[in-house]
Amino acid sequence: MTNSSSPLQAVEVRTYPIFTVRWLAVHALAIPTVFFLGAIAAMQFIRR
């Protein structure tokens, strides 16, 4: 019986960087979006 884990050892684990161009683009859009949604939601509770 052969060892079934030996072919799996040839796969190397790739570590990706956290801060990429995609990360910057997503957060450049997501952070102001969440801020404005929170501001609009807060405006709903303002009574004159």
UniProtKB/Swiss-Prot annotation:
Q: Which domain of life is it from?
A: Bacteria
Task: Determine if Transcription regulation is one of this entry's keywords.
Answer: no
Residues binding heme = H27
Q: Known Pfam families for this protein? A: Cytochrom_B559
Question: Some GO term, biological process aspect, for this entry: which one?
Answer: photosynthetic electron transport chain
Compartments reported by the entry: Cellular thylakoid membrane
Obligatory cofactor(s): heme b
Q: Which InterPro entries match?
A: PSII_cyt_b559_bsu, PSII_cyt_b559_CS, PSII_cyt_b559_N
The molecular function terms in GO held by this entry are:
electron transfer activity; heme binding; iron ion binding
What parts of the sequence cross the membrane?
Answer: 23-39
Q: How many and how are cofactors bound here?
A: With its partner (PsbE) binds heme. PSII binds additional chlorophylls, carotenoids and specific lipids.
The UniProt entry's GO CC annotations, sorted and at most eight, read: photosystem II reaction center; plasma membrane-derived thylakoid membrane
Its main localization is membrane
Q: How does it sit in the membrane?
A: Single-pass membrane protein
Q: List the keywords (alphabetical).
A: Electron transport, Heme, Iron, Membrane, Metal-binding, Photosynthesis, Photosystem II, Thylakoid, Transmembrane, Transmembrane helix, Transport
Q: Which residues form a coiled coil?
A: none
* Assembly, per entry: Heterodimer of an alpha subunit and a beta subunit. PSII is composed of 1 copy each of membrane proteins PsbA, PsbB, PsbC, PsbD, PsbE, PsbF, PsbH, PsbI, PsbJ, PsbK, PsbL, PsbM, PsbT, PsbX, PsbY, Psb30/Ycf12, peripheral proteins PsbO, CyanoQ (PsbQ), PsbU, PsbV and a large number of cofactors. It forms dimeric complexes.
Family note: Belongs to the PsbE/PsbF family.
The protein's role, per its UniProt record: This b-type cytochrome is tightly associated with the reaction center of photosystem II (PSII). PSII is a light-driven water:plastoquinone oxidoreductase that uses light energy to abstract electrons from H(2)O, generating O(2) and a proton gradient subsequently used for ATP formation. It consists of a core antenna complex that captures photons, and an electron transfer chain that converts photonic excitation into a charge separation.
Q: What is this protein called?
A: Cytochrome b559 subunit beta
